[in-house]
Amino acid sequence: MNAKEANFDGLVGPTHNYAGLSFGNVASLSNEKSDANPKAAAKQGLRKMKQLADLGFAQGVLPPQERPSLRLLRELGFSGKDADVIAKAAKQAPEMLAAASSASAMWTANAATVSPSADTSDGRVHFTPANLCSKLHRAIEHESTRRTLAAIFADEARFAVHDALPGTPALGDEGAANHTRFCSEYGAPGVEFFVYGRAEYRRGPEPTRFPARQTFEASRAVAQRHGLREEATIYAQQSPDVIDAGVFHNDVIAVGNRDTLFCHERAFVDKQAVYDALTASLGALGARLNVIEVPERAVSVADAVGSYLFNSQLLTREDGRQLLVVPQECRENANVSAYLDALAAGNGPIRDVRVFDLRESMKNGGGPACLRLRVVLNDAERAAVKPNVWIGDALFASLDAWIDKHYRDRLSPADLADPALLEESRTALDELTQILGLGSLYDFQR
């Protein structure tokens, strides 16, 4: 059946700030307490969506979550009117207010793991929201994520939106940032590839400096839940040493699309066994795996982390060639820029490189791949998606004007204590749900 890959990008929320909440994420820690520009952040992400839509790619948008999360702050014991809750948290536990105010849901690669209908036992598209239990500011996202996905993919005959896995370290799940899918054509059955950082119940190497956020057990549970074929499901462990170098998700060191895996030579434990397993599984489906392995001598792991070379989008153009979408930081690193020039000039599947300014997101450790959730949809499934979430000229203009109307152009950590920020955000989100036709999505609307 004819199918295409759609990308659903997260719209950056009004509370975008740099609180340094993500240990193991080098960029996040490096920019802690600096001033952010929520308006610029949202516009940078929106421009990427529009330009990719203009190139012919299916591009949707996911709305921000309500922040600050008054639910979290009240669960932590702060009481009174909303303004009182924020004031008390700012005075007594500013780190908790920062966690409750994070706009990290913008990185929708962590929103969920998605399996297309061609791979699942019941022939539906399956979504499992990630529990993100390794970080407080992200662990509060999954219920709102489930609600949003259920609103957009509402046809239960075609879509299955699950609850997140239990939020325990043994089942730590970071979503599609540690998952990709290989296939000959998007509508054909494929091989689903899960990458984990550690196993709870198996002995094996683990990082020693930064935590491994994804477990083997979580990846396996998602695959079982989605009804994937065992022979078309491959698990691999990410190299502990690259996690310790700041590769907190696999999409910082590898990206895949259709029959192509683009990765660093140090990405995986026992890499040849990984390549062999993928090759055999994909070969059984009549396709051939292309591995583009970047050697350390060309691009070091440090350069990869600093530029986010692999946190790129790998997209198939109408002519069958592949387009690599990278952040502008890749052109600011001489080694990475030279590698990209050679890559595009070569005879491999990647012939086109597009550069985007995503500076505001990048300063928090999120490149092009972090900002999007990939969903393969056939024609009937696409027709069942809520129509107002697809980016085109009209929606782009509406969202651009909405950002201008509601977003601040400067936000410091101290500004999170401003009770007006909550009201500004709620007013903005209330209007956004009308633009996107999603109904009463947020707690404050119910």
Swiss-Prot record:
GO terms for molecular function: N-succinylarginine dihydrolase activity. Transmembrane segments: none annotated. The active site is at E174, H249, C370 (nucleophile). GO terms for biological process: arginine catabolic process to glutamate; arginine catabolic process to succinate. Pathway: Amino-acid degradation; L-arginine degradation via AST pathway; L-glutamate and succinate from L-arginine: step 2/5. Substrate binds at residues 19-28, 110, 137-138, 213, 251, 364. Keywords: Arginine metabolism, Hydrolase. It catalyses: N(2)-succinyl-L-arginine + 2 H2O + 2 H(+) = N(2)-succinyl-L-ornithine + 2 NH4(+) + CO2. Its EC number is 3.5.3.23. The keyword Hydrolase applies. The keyword Heme does not apply. Belongs to the succinylarginine dihydrolase family. Homodimer. HAMAP family: AstB. Catalyzes the hydrolysis of N(2)-succinylarginine into N(2)-succinylornithine, ammonia and CO(2). PANTHER family: N-SUCCINYLARGININE DIHYDROLASE (PTHR30420:SF2). This is N-succinylarginine dihydrolase. The lineage of its organism: Bacteria, Pseudomonadati, Pseudomonadota, Betaproteobacteria, Burkholderiales.
